[in-house]
Amino acid sequence: MKMLFTIFGWLIAVIFLILSALCLWAGNWIPAIPLILAAVLLIPPLREKLSARLGISLPFWPRLVLIPVLFMLSVYLIFAGMGNKDSIYKNADIESRLMSIYDARMETFPVPYKSRYIDTKYGKVHVIISGPEDGPPILLLHASAMSSWSWLYNIKELNSKYRTYAIDTIGDAGKSVLSNIEVYPADGPSLAALYEEIMDSLDVASAYFIGASQGGYISSNVALYAPERVNGLILCGPMGYTGTNASVFRILLTTMFPIPPLQNSATRWAFGDDPAINAVVSDWFGAILEGVISRQARPAPFSKDQINKIDMPVLLLLGSRDGLVGNPEDTEVLAENFPDARVHVLDTGHLISAEKPDRFNSLVMDFIENRKE
């Protein structure tokens, strides 16, 4: 039994040393100190030298308590170093990098547009408005860790007939700004109320909603709690229709240790292997992993009863290789509870609208044209 404990201790020590090396590689040396100390306590020769140097004994039970305490201290120091009590951004440099990338992406936006800021109870919400002024309205709600520039693959086709309002999610990276980072729409009813407030400011009585990932979760909540504002839903790899995918811990690991190999791996895993897509999202996503702690509602799974209440037309688009949402078959089964839904599974990862823009645009335009009231 003692040998078993020793082997297990060595394995945990190796893990701690690897984690401390990742901290040092990321330039975050303070959290590495408790990890190294915990590893020393787990390795008998090093522990004996430490005990002799300090002139104290280190019995088993105190060590058993001290080691997890040191580990938790390291985790706390990692996240404390990322935090900023006044902003979702770790520091001004991260924010500046992201805004520069945002502006550069908007230089490639294929249609004329105007930006508008709307004052809400949570802060300023940034909206990109484009398309014919007399066109039927569509609200575009982007995926988490993206922003409204991500619709650049679809906007030209949509604006051929429709007026679009691409909204930067408040509390996420982008040009919307929370007044207080501790006060944000954290549940379905508050999300619906916020988007009603935005629509009132835009003088939009009702609209089709196109929501990707977290944007799909937000759109679904507006449909649930303010159904009169939603003409129809286009949901692209939406959150809230399956349980939390265990692989999201990969994102957490990369956030804790933002080194290039982990960042590149996380980008490919989240957005697929398409080099063109990775070239567009990698610098943006890398900066987010390095220094953004978003403040937004966590997508709890919708119940079958809730889905059944979404009785407006729904177009559900799923990616067969989506590493974030998970198995599309599970979502398809749950989608059977929609009273009026079409479901399509595309050969894509998570960013359906960017990976297969022509197919996405065709499905969306056909859906709206055939469902007009």
Predicted regions: what they are:
Residues V75-P136, Y162, A205, E369-E373:
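Alpha/beta-hydrolase fold catalytic core
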Residues I129-G174:
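Conserved HGGG/HGGXW glycine-rich cap/lid loop of the alpha/beta-hydrolase fold
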Residues A166-I210:
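Active-site loop/oxyanion-hole signature of alpha/beta-hydrolase fold enzymes
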Residues Y217-Y225, G232-I259:
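Flexible "cap/lid" loop of the alpha/beta hydrolase fold
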Residues I310, L316-L318:
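Short beta-strand/loop motif that positions the catalytic acidic residue
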Residues L318-T348, A354:
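Conserved loop-alpha-helix segment in the C-terminal half of the alpha/beta-hydrolase fold
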